[in-house]
């Protein structure tokens, strides 16, 4: 199925939710991302219709932990209204008084299901995992669940 037209535009994604949902010491999370509407590789066909789109973001949790990151995402149209978006990012984590993730370099994998709510705006539900992929002495990882508003600009 073709990707809806909003997917080929630059967008902002604003998310709120819960940081560290699998732990009793969870906290709130807020996130802002800039989503590029352009394929990272332009018109080149590297692996079929890969269309990997870059994004950058900033996350802050209720314990003053901060995560600055950049990555790639791929949109899959499920229907004319629904989109499934897996993504991967790498970034810098400053824990402050938040959970110790074992290293400042952290990687995030995420899945998002979003629905077109009109005027090329979408609302989405996200689940992600952040960990250092064992480059640190410890690798506790953390999961987050958020709701997003995605709006083109």
Predicted regions mapped to residue ranges:
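Mid-chain, well-packed structural core segment of small domains
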Residues: 82-110
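Solvent-exposed loop/turn segments connecting transmembrane beta-strands
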Residues: 19-28, 58-69, 78-80, 97-104, ...
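Membrane-embedded beta-strand positions of outer-membrane beta-barrel proteins
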Residues: 12-16, 54-56, 84-88, 109, ...
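Cleavable N-terminal export/targeting peptides
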Residues: 1-9
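N-terminal, post-signal-peptide region of Sec/Tat-exported proteins
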Residues: 28-61
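Repeated loop/turn-to-beta-strand initiation elements of outer-membrane beta-barrel proteins
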Residues: 10-12, 38-47, 80-84, 119-125
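Residue-level signature of outer-membrane beta-barrel architecture
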Residues: 34-39, 74-76, 115, 129, ...
């Amino acid at each position: 199925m073709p990707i809806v037209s909003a997917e080929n535009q630059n967008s902002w994604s604003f998310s709120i939710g819960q940081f560290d949902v699998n732990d009793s010491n969870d906290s709130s999370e807020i996130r802002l991302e800039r989503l590029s509407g352009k394929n990272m590789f332009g018109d080149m066909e590297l692996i079929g219709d890969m269309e990997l789109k870059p994004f950058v973001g900033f996350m802050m949790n209720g314990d003053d932990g901060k995560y600055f990151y950049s990555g790639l995402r791929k949109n899959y149209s499920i229907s004319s209204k629904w989109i499934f978006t897996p993504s991967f990012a790498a970034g810098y984590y400053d824990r402050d008084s938040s959970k110790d993730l074992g290293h400042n370099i952290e990687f995030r994998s995420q899945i998002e299901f979003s629905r077109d709510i009109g005027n090329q705006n979408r609302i989405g539900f996200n689940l992600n995992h952040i960990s250092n992929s064992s480059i640190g002495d410890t690798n506790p990882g953390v999961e987050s669940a958020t709701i997003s508003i995605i709006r083109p600009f």
